[in-house]
Amino acid sequence: MTQVTVKELAKVVDTPVERLLQQMREAGLPHTAAEQVVTDNEKQALLTHLKSGHKAKVEEPRKITLQRKTTSTLRVAGSKSISVEVRKKKVFVQRSPEEIEAERKREMDERRAVENAARQKAEEEAKRRAEEDARNQPAAGQPASAPAQPVAAAEPVREAPAPAAAAPAPASAAPSADARKRDEQRRPDKPRADDRNARGGDGERKNAPHRASVKEKAPAPRVAPRTTDEESDSFRRGGRGKSRLKKRNAHGFQSPTGPVIRDVAIGETITVGELSAQMSVKAAEVIKFMFKMGTPVTINQVLDQETAQLIAEELGHKVTLVSDNALEDSLAESLKFEGESFSRAPVVTVMGHVDHGKTSLLDYIRRAKVAAGEAGGITQHIGAYHVETERGMVTFLDTPGHAAFTAMRARGAKATDIVILVVAADDGVMPQTIEAVQHAVAAGVPLVVAVNKIDKPGADLDRIRSELSVHGVTSEEWGGDTPFVSVSAKMGTGVDELLEAVLLQAEVLELKATPSAPGRGVVVESRLDKGRGPVATVLVQDGTLRQGDMVLVGSNFGRIRAMLDENGKPVKEAGPSIPVEILGLDGTPDAGDEMSVLADEKKAREVALFRQGKFREVKLARAHAGKLENIFENMGQEEKKTLNIVLKSDVRGSLEALQGALGGLGNDEVQVRVVGGGVGGITESDANLALASNAVLFGFNVRADAGARKIVEQEGLDMRYYNVIYDIIEDVKKALTGMLGSDVRENILGIAEVRDVFRSPKFGAIAGCMVLEGTVYRNRPIRVLREDIVIFEGELESLRRFKDDAAEVRAGMECGIGVKSYNDVKVGDKIEVFEKVQVARSL
């Protein structure tokens, strides 16, 4: 008999020693150390213990599924056989004794509860019948009540005394029993009360036919009026059944007896579908009504307030006009703030014609090289800077002077307190100078005229004063109220006097602001930065703007994540008259949008969504109105050639300026259509849009990403980059000129006068002519003029000089001319030789 230690046994069975010792202790063995010896009997005992424990853990299967499959062959006509396979499946579930006992108890409890309910119901039914018989007995009379007593006396004695009220009126039991039988046949799921009745139910069932025969022989007044199955069923169920019966018999919908007048709320704009929904009529009814009025509409068409009011009133509804600006009014009320006001720095806008030195003047004031960084040396964005001078702080807005930036200059005049009008002394008043004066007058902003480049020879200040006085700008030297300052942005001459004049105007205006109020301002510029998202340059006009504020900017909103000054340095807050860049908006706002700080995000989101919806509705209504107005004008005309453009820019202001400038190009035959535009780089979606609309991709100070470049290369799209606005406009003009085609012009080459007429057997009438002007060429189109009136137009067929064919004959020489298919040449006629030349057209 081999003996091993606990340690060796653990190694053999591949288990830890500690676990083996624990199992041996559970098996009742006395081993406690790894060196103790284990006999064969102890091994057997340990094995038996482990097997029993394993069997206890493994549960017997509680569900057995038996499947049986039989196959048979079915013969059909045509000696064909079909195999039919029948599958049967049975599932046997083994339940534990506890579950069986619990199920048995539950069934007994349910049976007992059903019997108690049936007994109680039978007692109530008997009591009710007794009460009904008692009520009907006086009306029935004595003759009818006599035969009932023997039947009641002959009723067998039950084992237990039944309720006293069950004895009278046994004749009425049969009808109720018959009614119950009919009810049970009609509703088989309802348990029968007779089967679950108390003791004596069998005797009652045996006597039921006899009682029925007695009832048939009884006089009619003895029996209560018969009820329908539903009524008897409702009586057995009690009062609750009566209410359910009434509910079941009641109609679900009652038709209105007259027209329903509804209150219809109509805003500034409403679609046909929304109007019909408010009136609870089909949209087809509204469309039919509009057709009768002579206006074809669709279900999604936007109606104005007056039209919608007319439709609703004609259809008989009550109209309530709603102001769509209620939300805006509540916003304006919430933004009111009262606090202590302090003086603020003036906001000065520098305006003038292109290349008159606006940015160079600001460059000298700021002591920074800004003009050198602009593409082409011209300003194409609004630049906002604040400068600390010896006399105080001044905020400058530098606007572009190019003709395309009209809207941008108008925004600059709107957001400013004082306008510096820069006029070059050597160039004088130019178109954009006059436009800047008009913007300043329209905004009610005082002007300070800076006559720049006075260091150049040929500067004439009196000429500039005279030209500006024509447009209502009169200098103080001439008795007006506009200060004129002579400056030189290159040398710095007169800059201090200019700043002094600006600050003097600011003192007269008494500019005030409340720094403790929530921030409020205007968007100067906006762009889409690839790394930082939408970035907006904001000029704070009142209050203090802080990092973390919830701002509403036009139809965009967001929480300020960061603020940067004009030098790109982060700042925590910005007071009045300070320009800053803010990050955190959900989109790029339009330049000129007002910015407000709100208390909560919910209000900001609500107003932003309202403004977006309102802008969309107004845009759709305007577009549809334009289509209806132009439908008759364009009828019968040839379709214009269109140059489609997808335009992407670095900032919102430049995008608007380019869209306006390009949209103004064209004539009656060609036009420019900007099918897509946005702020940011050229993306893959822009390239797909250009491909779908057959458009040209223009990038202004932006570039295309890898996906867009791949599509452009694969599809052969035309994509161009620009950084100067002149180049875009010139290229688009050239493209439109190429689309115009060419004009056909006629150049008169020579004129010959007929001096004599000869006859030729080959050519017919030959005109002997003297060439008066130019040169006469063979095989060129000609006109025959008689008394300066064209009588024939054809081709010069034969040209000879001294009986020899000639290719051309110059002025002062004689020649013979044969006109093809024309023989009515007379002396004194003139023959005009010309050519048709195609000439390129221009806009």
From Swiss-Prot:
Region described as G1: spans on this chain: 352-359
Comp. bias (Basic residues): 237-250
Spans annotated as G2: 377-381
Binding site for GTP: 352-359, 398-402, 452-455
SUPFAM superfamilies per the UniProt record, alphabetical: Initiation factor IF2/eIF5b, domain 3, P-loop containing nucleoside triphosphate hydrolases, Putative DNA-binding domain, Translation proteins
Region annotation (Disordered) ranges: 94-259
Xref: Pfam families: EF-G_D2, GTP_EFTU, IF-2, IF2_assoc, IF2_N
Domain tr-type G: 343-512
Predominant location: cytoplasm
Role noted for this protein: One of the essential components for the initiation of protein synthesis. Protects formylmethionyl-tRNA from spontaneous hydrolysis and promotes its binding to the 30S ribosomal subunits. Also involved in the hydrolysis of GTP during the formation of the 70S ribosomal complex.
Protein name: Translation initiation factor IF-2
Organism annotation: Pseudomonas savastanoi pv. phaseolicola (strain 1448A / Race 6) (Pseudomonas syringae pv. phaseolicola (strain 1448A / Race 6))
Gene: infB
